Amino acid sequence: MGFTQQQEALVNSSWESFKQNPSYSVLFYTIILEKAPAAKGMFSFLKDSAGVVDSPKLQAHAEQVFGMVRDSAIQLQATGEVVLKNGSLGAIHIQKGVVDPHFVVVKEALLKTIKEASGDKWSEELSIAWEVAYDGLATAIKKAMS
């Protein structure tokens, strides 16, 4: 069964909740660094800081990550596959030293952040929708890395 309109709607509505509060971007990177402290150096806006500090670059990158997952949901619903809009995304991930376990860490951080942003609207269906959309994006990035 393909990605449904309902799943796309769930991702879209929770994406809006995420965007409304900049503290969710800080939470996202805090979770990543709790799970993979060595990943700090992969992010230019974090590598010289003592911890996760809110900044315009951090906000922009978090919105870009979550936005790409949202775009993946739209693509999955429309065509059943994710095609990267940024052709250099694979090369960027290779340059930063991203490997498979990093995708797992980011997925976990993304889901925990969306759970927090969604509050009482969080559900198993919402989690699955974000998981499937993220997995589609991760697969497309990994393909671009090979």
Swiss-Prot record:
<dbReference type="GO" id="GO:0020037">
    <property type="term" value="F:heme binding"/>
</dbReference>
<comment type="similarity">
    <text>Belongs to the plant globin family.</text>
</comment>
<comment type="function">
    <text>Leghemoglobin that reversibly binds oxygen O(2) through a pentacoordinated heme iron. In root nodules, facilitates the diffusion of oxygen to the bacteroids while preventing the bacterial nitrogenase from being inactivated by buffering dioxygen, nitric oxide and carbon monoxide, and promoting the formation of reactive oxygen species (ROS, e.g. H(2)O(2)). This role is essential for symbiotic nitrogen fixation (SNF).</text>
</comment>
<keyword id="KW-0813">Transport</keyword>
<dbReference type="InterPro" id="IPR000971">
    <property type="entry name" value="Globin"/>
</dbReference>
<dbReference type="GO" id="GO:0009877">
    <property type="term" value="P:nodulation"/>
</dbReference>
<feature type="modified residue" description="Nitrated tyrosine">
    <location>
        <position position="134"/>
    </location>
</feature>
<dbReference type="GO" id="GO:0005829">
    <property type="term" value="C:cytosol"/>
</dbReference>
<dbReference type="InterPro" id="IPR019824">
    <property type="entry name" value="Leghaemoglobin_Fe_BS"/>
</dbReference>
<dbReference type="GO" id="GO:0046872">
    <property type="term" value="F:metal ion binding"/>
</dbReference>
<feature type="binding site" description="proximal binding residue">
    <location>
        <position position="93"/>
    </location>
    <ligand>
        <name>heme b</name>
    </ligand>
</feature>
<dbReference type="GO" id="GO:0009737">
    <property type="term" value="P:response to abscisic acid"/>
</dbReference>
<dbReference type="GO" id="GO:0005634">
    <property type="term" value="C:nucleus"/>
</dbReference>
<dbReference type="GO" id="GO:0019825">
    <property type="term" value="F:oxygen binding"/>
</dbReference>
<feature type="binding site">
    <location>
        <position position="96"/>
    </location>
    <ligand>
        <name>heme b</name>
    </ligand>
</feature>
<keyword id="KW-0535">Nitrogen fixation</keyword>
<keyword id="KW-0944">Nitration</keyword>
<keyword id="KW-0539">Nucleus</keyword>
<feature type="modified residue" description="Nitrated tyrosine">
    <location>
        <position position="24"/>
    </location>
</feature>
<keyword id="KW-0479">Metal-binding</keyword>
<dbReference type="Pfam" id="PF00042">
    <property type="entry name" value="Globin"/>
</dbReference>
<keyword id="KW-0963">Cytoplasm</keyword>
<dbReference type="InterPro" id="IPR009050">
    <property type="entry name" value="Globin-like_sf"/>
</dbReference>
<feature type="binding site">
    <location>
        <position position="61"/>
    </location>
    <ligand>
        <name>O2</name>
    </ligand>
</feature>
<keyword id="KW-0536">Nodulation</keyword>
<keyword id="KW-0408">Iron</keyword>
<keyword id="KW-0597">Phosphoprotein</keyword>
<dbReference type="InterPro" id="IPR012292">
    <property type="entry name" value="Globin/Proto"/>
</dbReference>
<dbReference type="GO" id="GO:0005344">
    <property type="term" value="F:oxygen carrier activity"/>
</dbReference>
<feature type="domain" description="Globin">
    <location>
        <begin position="2"/>
        <end position="146"/>
    </location>
</feature>
<dbReference type="InterPro" id="IPR001032">
    <property type="entry name" value="Leghaemoglobin-like"/>
</dbReference>
<protein>
    <recommendedName>
        <fullName>Leghemoglobin 49</fullName>
    </recommendedName>
</protein>
<comment type="subunit">
    <text>Monomer.</text>
</comment>
<keyword id="KW-0349">Heme</keyword>
<feature type="modified residue" description="Phosphoserine">
    <location>
        <position position="44"/>
    </location>
</feature>
<keyword id="KW-0561">Oxygen transport</keyword>
<feature type="binding site">
    <location>
        <position position="44"/>
    </location>
    <ligand>
        <name>heme b</name>
    </ligand>
</feature>
<feature type="modified residue" description="Nitrated tyrosine">
    <location>
        <position position="29"/>
    </location>
</feature>
